[in-house]
Amino acid sequence: MTISPPERGSTAKSQVEKVDNPATFELFGKPGHFDRALAKGPKTTTWVWNLHANAHDFDSHTSDLEEVSRKIFSAHFGHLAVIFIWLSGAFFHGARFSNFSGWLADPTHVKPSAQVVWPVFGQEILNGDMGAGFQGIQITSGLFHVWRAWGITNETQLMSLAIGALVMAGLMLNAGVFHYHKAAPKLEWFQNVESMLNHHLAGLLGLGSLSWTGHLLHVSLPTTKLMDAIDAGQPLVLNGKTIASVADIPLPHEFFNQDLIAQLYPGFGAGIGAFFSGDWAAYSDFLTFKGGINPVTGSMWMSDIAHHHLAIAVLFIVAGHMYRTNWGIGHSIKEILEGQKGDPLLFPATKGHDGLFEFMTTSWHAQLGVNLAMLGSLSIIVAQHMYAMPPYPYMAIDYPTQIGLFTHHMWIGGFLIVGAAAHAAIAMIRDYDPAKHVDNVLDRVLKARDAIISHLNWVCIWLGAHSFGLYVHNDTMRALGRPQDMFSDSAISIQPVFAQWIQGIHAGAAGSTAPNALAGVSEVFNGSTIAVGGKVAAAAIPLGTADFMVHHIHAFTIHVTVLILLKGVLYARSSRLVPDKANLGFRFPCDGPGRGGTCQVSAWDHVFLGLFWMYNSLSVVIFHFSWKMQSDVWGTVNADGSVQHITNGNFANSAITINGWLRDFLWAQAAQVINSYGSNTSAYGLMFLGAHFVWAFSLMFLFSGRGYWQELIESIVWAHNKLKVAPAIQPRALSITQGRAVGVAHYLLGGIATTWAFFHAHILVVG
């Protein structure tokens, strides 16, 4: 910790400026008001593309960093308003169109639904039998499981949440207008990182987690304990009354009665006194460290989750008191950064992290790049935890939801990480001043970029040739009828020994790292099979040769994605081919006439290519997950305890050839979507075809050149002129960059929607 000099202590002056900047629709209603050229109105059809490209590119509106910061800040409130409206819609559907109460009464037999299709021209066929007499569309978002975990017991509570979320949306919209048009923060407020860290860590994460712990302890714990007892067929008694159904459960506010909640958790009887006297063991019945999962619901123990949030709250409240603001104590981020000088042997950057503080507080693109990389990685980590440590009741046996949440969080993470590279490249072009970064860490990385990229390229070639080589070998041997010469568990075995060792460490650690834990951290690490309602909720995930092979395909595709994105960032400002890239900007088609071979070299083009490889990588990941779980984990548990897996364990023998992936995964599991017509999953059949069409449509933009279209358009304009119906706005072909943008958007949209329909139609039928 560093003690600040006295002059740093007086920063308590107002950091908000009163502005009179009326929010007038006269201005907003004028298209392109933010750009002098666009405000003149359209002369050619290119105008509408430029309008969309620049509407949110605040850097292009003004070079005033304070004004840009205020626009971003205001836009965040608008974004939050949209999120609250979206949440309200989810709550409203749960309140008005769902079988939530029916699902709560029998979660192992009733399927969740929150949408009922009205008959217009026969689409009521989409309403499937959800059980308990309810007809609707099955949802796979996991909302019912989350709501049960919160302690929501009826639709009235959901309607209250729907109304509350709309009120919050209104407040957010109001805040967005107020903090731009009436009282706007000054630039120094946006750059006051210590204050921001203190408030976000202690307030948002610390007090937020503490508040959530309060809800979990006082509402979720008693409510879910009563529901679990009902589901287990052993209802509990409260005040002499048997709680035999969800309707009998007391309302949340009734649990503020200490005597009532103490009948479920005696620790509540100790009151707040035990906290101040240090007798924390009195609370050990509701702040637990059990480990494993609840055998009734197949989810983590609610008392473990409450304990976790309490620990998080304590950590973050402490963390939120570490940074120096108006008082002369605490850390200064600038001083911490400037104290890092780099290892003289491994990384000889004599200036270390000098200049980084200024770069990160004046380049919001740089800051956003870091944040997107972190958040994207976090989303991918969430995807893994949804099945390994299921947090919500009965979610583990809702296989469509499990596949849906895994796929969703993987793709969200992928898009955010590509976005991180995009904004890092924009930061390098618009915000990086080489004169301010001499021999610091950024400068050293840029000086070493040839070594970094060529090594990464070598790694990609090695991984690609070897991982694909294993598959080519196996396909050849199987084609020639020589199974004994294949890489497989039963022939030439290549076991993933490192991964198996890590599984073993996690399985064995439970007794030593957490002495009082009753079970390991997750059943996937050599654990036992947990059955809920006759279905597998969690089980050990055995790894073999097939996993070793596909994991190296993962390594290959991820490294290629990183190669493309990192090359885009490191060569954003200049390269041997185009030394003046920084002057050409983030996106440009080619380096002008007479410079052949310089097309598709901009930082934007690297993001464009990175998106395809991100999609490539994650398609293999979600296919691997989907097939592996159906083959080796998910299934029904027979009376004798044996498990009938959905695809009968065919992964180990089929996933070791390319032909096996095509035949036993893609083709075999497409049976449901291809044969869905005439059934309640027929919408997925239509989506499957429609999304294929959108995907194919993208190829038209990706495979053809701009000149072809310009030539075609000119002949069409000639025909219009002949008929005297020529438009006032001159039609022009899309630019190369615009065409590629339209192409990649439809490629990803078509690919993702195709995969969605393929997964859903299959798992809704067999899962």
UniProtKB/Swiss-Prot annotation:
The entry's free-text remark on the cofactor is: PSI electron transfer chain: 5 chlorophyll a, 1 chlorophyll a', 2 phylloquinones and 3 4Fe-4S clusters. PSI core antenna: 90 chlorophyll a, 22 carotenoids, 3 phospholipids and 1 galactolipid. P700 is a chlorophyll a/chlorophyll a' dimer, A0 is one or more chlorophyll a, A1 is one or both phylloquinones and FX is a shared 4Fe-4S iron-sulfur center.
Q: Which InterPro entries match?
A: PSI_PsaA (IPR006243), PSI_PsaA/B (IPR001280), PSI_PsaA/B_CS (IPR020586), PSI_PsaA/B_sf (IPR036408)
Q: What is its EC number?
A: 1.97.1.12
* Catalytic EC class: oxidoreductase
Record's Pfam families? PsaA_PsaB
GO terms under biological process = photosynthesis
Give the residues the record marks as binding [4Fe-4S] cluster. C590, C599
Signal sequence extent: none
Which residue spans adopt a coiled-coil conformation according to this UniProt entry?
A: none
A GO MF term = chlorophyll binding
What positions does the entry give for phylloquinone binding? W709
What topology does it adopt in the membrane? Multi-pass membrane protein
Q: Which reaction does it catalyse?
A: reduced [plastocyanin] + hnu + oxidized [2Fe-2S]-[ferredoxin] = oxidized [plastocyanin] + reduced [2Fe-2S]-[ferredoxin]
Chief subcellular location = membrane
Q: Where does it reside?
A: Cellular thylakoid membrane
Q: Which domain of life is it from?
A: Bacteria
Listed binding positions for chlorophyll a' are: H692
Sorted alphabetically, the keyword list is: 4Fe-4S, Chlorophyll, Chromophore, Electron transport, Iron, Iron-sulfur, Magnesium, Membrane, Metal-binding, Oxidoreductase, Photosynthesis, Photosystem I, Thylakoid, Transmembrane, Transmembrane helix, Transport
Member of which family?
Answer: Belongs to the PsaA/PsaB family.
Q: Which HAMAP family match?
A: PSI_PsaA
Q: How does it assemble?
A: The PsaA/B heterodimer binds the P700 chlorophyll special pair and subsequent electron acceptors. PSI consists of a core antenna complex that captures photons, and an electron transfer chain that converts photonic excitation into a charge separation. The cyanobacterial PSI reaction center is composed of one copy each of PsaA,B,C,D,E,F,I,J,K,L,M and X, and forms trimeric complexes.
According to its UniProt entry, the function of this protein is described as: PsaA and PsaB bind P700, the primary electron donor of photosystem I (PSI), as well as the electron acceptors A0, A1 and FX. PSI is a plastocyanin/cytochrome c6-ferredoxin oxidoreductase, converting photonic excitation into a charge separation, which transfers an electron from the donor P700 chlorophyll pair to the spectroscopically characterized acceptors A0, A1, FX, FA and FB in turn. Oxidized P700 is reduced on the lumenal side of the thylakoid membrane by plastocyanin or cytochrome c6.
Put simply, this protein is called Photosystem I P700 chlorophyll a apoprotein A1
Lineage of origin: Bacteria, Bacillati, Cyanobacteriota, Cyanophyceae, Synechococcales
Name of the coding gene: psaA
